[in-house]
């Protein structure tokens, strides 16, 4: 899974009818005595209005590691990236992530077909934690239909990691094996 961009943040804009925002690349850090507020700044994709998502509210300055505090103060791009993709921050602050157009599947399938006699072990690696169904990954990667994927799993031609279900969403690296046509 190759990264093509960060997910859009879906929340209503107060100025226009659009719901898609993108990170501005900046944080706002406000200290009031010993208490600190940190917000991730977003821009509306249509009108450009800036809005903020609370990252930390009224936390004691000493409760944040100095390196983390410095990352907020210097608008560290990797911290902006990590918080933009944070499903827990999205859930906590009431928005959702739109992963449309943020990834593409790179595969060597022109060099392998499920009809070939050899078995193959496939490593699926994620540059982005895109939540995608296992079934869809297999369809795209092997260039076969949903029904064919289900048949291959039922016949154990596709062997998935034990706790994995075709309908489950994955976002971390995993391996699976496709048994060749000659090994059935």
Where are these regions (language model features)?
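Conserved "cap/hinge" positions at secondary-structure junctions
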Residues: 55, 162, 178-180
């Amino acid at each position: 899974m190759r990264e093509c961009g960060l997910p859009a943040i879906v929340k209503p804009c107060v100025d226009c009818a659009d719901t898609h925002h993108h990170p501005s690349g900046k944080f706002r850090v406000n200290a009031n005595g010993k208490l600190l507020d940190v917000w991730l700044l977003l821009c509306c994709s249509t009108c450009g209005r800036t809005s903020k998502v609370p990252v930390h509210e009224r936390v004691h300055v000493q409760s944040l590691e100095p390196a983390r505090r410095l990352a907020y103060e210097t608008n560290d791009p990797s911290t902006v990236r990590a918080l933009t993709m944070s499903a827990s921050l999205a859930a906590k602050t009431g928005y959702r992530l739109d992963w449309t157009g943020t990834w593409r599947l790179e595969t060597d399938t022109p060099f392998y077909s499920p009809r070939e006699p050899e078995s193959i072990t496939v490593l699926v690696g994620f540059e982005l934690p895109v939540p995608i169904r296992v079934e869809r990954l297999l369809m795209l990667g092997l260039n076969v239909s949903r029904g064919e994927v289900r048949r291959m799993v039922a016949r154990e031609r596709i062997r998935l990691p034990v706790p994995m279900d075709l309908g489950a969403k994955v976002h971390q690296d995993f391996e699976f094996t496709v048994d060749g046509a000659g090994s059935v």
